[in-house]
């Protein structure tokens, strides 16, 4: 069995078992050699702490080392530049062939938001941008920003509808009040109530005249006639 070679320490390990490799990787000598290796690499590239951020911004996106997502397409890239770590791909052992190597922690979940950040942005331009560029939402799903806009629009519509309803009711009340006032001031001869009262008065006077004229009997409305009529009935 070939012995394991450490590129950072430039030695062959006496014990090539996983336990021996783990002990060597956590050893002080290996850590110091690894730090020195990367310091020399940065010095050769001309990278200093002052221009390190600029170097990160100017990286080529197609570079597998600059773009970590490229490592999922070619899992051997990590082993090519890091021979110390034994290669055991989680995605190859998984039953799902398209499952990526994503650890199950709270920071890798899709809906995780740090406590100091708002889950929904308060900037309307930010929400509109994400709505226009959100190509991964399902057709039947509603974005949280859409729900907020929908609730605001629904509430404003209800408020406007209630105002219109109250306005219409007030107009109807004013019309009814004006009609009642006009009826009190003016007496309409075509009004059925007035006609009934007028007819009753006419009928009463007609009956009185008819009774007193045709039958030649005194009217009951005259007090003297009523007295004579009562005395005649008694006798």
UniProtKB/Swiss-Prot annotation:
Major place of residence: nucleus
GO biological process terms, semicolon-separated: mRNA 5'-splice site recognition; spliceosomal snRNP assembly
Biased amino acid composition, Basic and acidic residues: 169-189, 205-217, 225-235
UniProt biased composition (Low complexity): 134-168, 192-203
Places the protein is found: Nucleus
Keywords: Metal-binding, Nucleus, Ribonucleoprotein, RNA-binding, Zinc, Zinc-finger
Zn finger intervals (Matrin-type): 4-36
Disulfide bonds: none
Function: Component of the spliceosomal U1 snRNP, which is essential for recognition of the pre-mRNA 5' splice-site and the subsequent assembly of the spliceosome. U1-C is directly involved in initial 5' splice-site recognition for both constitutive and regulated alternative splicing. The interaction with the 5' splice-site seems to precede base-pairing between the pre-mRNA and the U1 snRNA. Stimulates commitment or early (E) complex formation by stabilizing the base pairing of the 5' end of the U1 snRNA and the 5' splice-site region.
Family label: Belongs to the U1 small nuclear ribonucleoprotein C family.
Protein name as annotated: U1 small nuclear ribonucleoprotein C
Naturally occurring in which organism (per UniProt): Plasmodium falciparum (isolate 3D7)
């Amino acid at each position: 069995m070939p012995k394991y070679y450490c590129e950072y320490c430039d030695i062959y390990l006496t014990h090539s078992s996983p336990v021996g490799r783990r002990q060597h990787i956590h050893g002080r000598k290996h850590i110091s050699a690894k730090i020195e290796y990367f310091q020399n690499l940065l010095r050769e590239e001309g990278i200093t702490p002052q221009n390190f951020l600029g170097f990160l911004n100017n990286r080529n996106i197609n570079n597998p080392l600059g773009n970590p997502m490229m490592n999922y397409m070619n899992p051997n890239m990590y082993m090519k530049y890091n021979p110390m770590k034994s290669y055991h791909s989680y995605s190859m052992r998984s039953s799902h062939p398209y499952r990526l190597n994503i650890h199950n922690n709270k920071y890798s979940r899709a809906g995780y938001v740090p406590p100091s950040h708002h889950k929904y942005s308060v900037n309307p331009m930010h929400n509109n941008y994400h709505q226009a560029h959100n190509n991964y939402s399902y057709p039947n799903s509603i974005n949280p920003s859409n729900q907020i806009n929908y609730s605001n629009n629904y509430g404003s519509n209800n408020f406007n509808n209630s105002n219109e309803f109250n306005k219409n009711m007030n107009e109807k009340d004013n019309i009814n009040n004006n009609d009642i006032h006009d009826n009190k001031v003016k007496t309409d001869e075509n009004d059925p109530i007035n006609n009934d009262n007028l007819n009753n008065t006419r009928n009463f006077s007609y009956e009185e005249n008819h009774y007193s004229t045709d039958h030649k009997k005194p009217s009951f409305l005259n007090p003297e006639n009523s007295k004579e009529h009562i005395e005649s009935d008694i006798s």
